[in-house]
């Protein structure tokens, strides 16, 4: 039977969804982070998870556990964000030599539970966050907006639907990502060296020493092609913000816009599908020996509003007053 319920996971208030052989715990007070997604039947933990994590641990390092949703993700040079009708100065929260603003604030805010319910097909949670003068970040970015998140769990996995609504009278920058943390190994009893990652990619986006785009798009080298042909081990080596244009790949002979992680000895896979709004992948693994890696889908390049490249290359867009932007993701195992 599919269910939803209010619960507490080691001190962290959550809504638990159970459906289709999966269980998901969403910490609505920590940015609606999916702090655990488990395929119960196959013994797979999709996202980085520790049963010892307290609420305080998750709050202090929200970017590196579960599925954190980021608004204004990754880096903005010197904290500057230029839109078509304004220039905003965000706090520089990444120290020298980087000196950038990084990752925004949405993933650290207390979200509101709108509703949760289950039926014979699925279990659903809807949360929201209203950004206005009450948010301490508003002095840097005085643009009202609303974020609505819908999580649907079923036999088809977990769907994550993101909606951004501009409630201001000015242009609202659109740059959205999830700092997706994949447990490594993800299968009970498996070994990280047996994992292989497939990421269908186009050009590599060159980054400078501050982890900002040089605006050069590079042809793929042999190490890049390991992502494309599915031979890349995402652990036990340092993958440090490898950034690429996203392309479509194949899953069981069908077009698949997303990444696939496989445990080679068993053939078990995590399939991570995203909607076309996500135009870039960044791969990062915290030096490769900490039990997780991050295939991060982004709707726009790092520092996109400040770049000289055209919007159809950077992915950057803006919402007019009362406009709505939506993007979707789905996680499932095979």
Language-model segment annotations:
Residues 314-325:
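Intrinsically disordered, low-complexity Pro/Gly/Ser/Thr-rich segments with frequent PxxP/GP/PP motifs
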Residues 77-78, 137, 315:
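Short, conserved secondary-structure segments in the cores of folded domains
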Residues 1-9, 18, 86, 91-154:
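Extended, loop-rich substrate-binding clefts of extracytoplasmic carbohydrate-active enzymes
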Residues 82-86, 115-125, 152-157, 186, ...:
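A short, structured loop/turn motif at beta-sheet edges
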Residues 17, 28, 39, 129-180, ...:
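Acidic, contiguous internal or C-terminal segments within carbohydrate-active enzymes
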Residues 100-112, 116, 230-314:
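Acidic/His-leaning functional-site neighborhoods
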Residues 1-95, 252-278, 287, 323-332:
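Beta-strand-rich N-terminal accessory domains
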Residues 89, 171-172, 181-275:
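Active-site/ligand-binding surface loops and adjacent short beta/alpha elements
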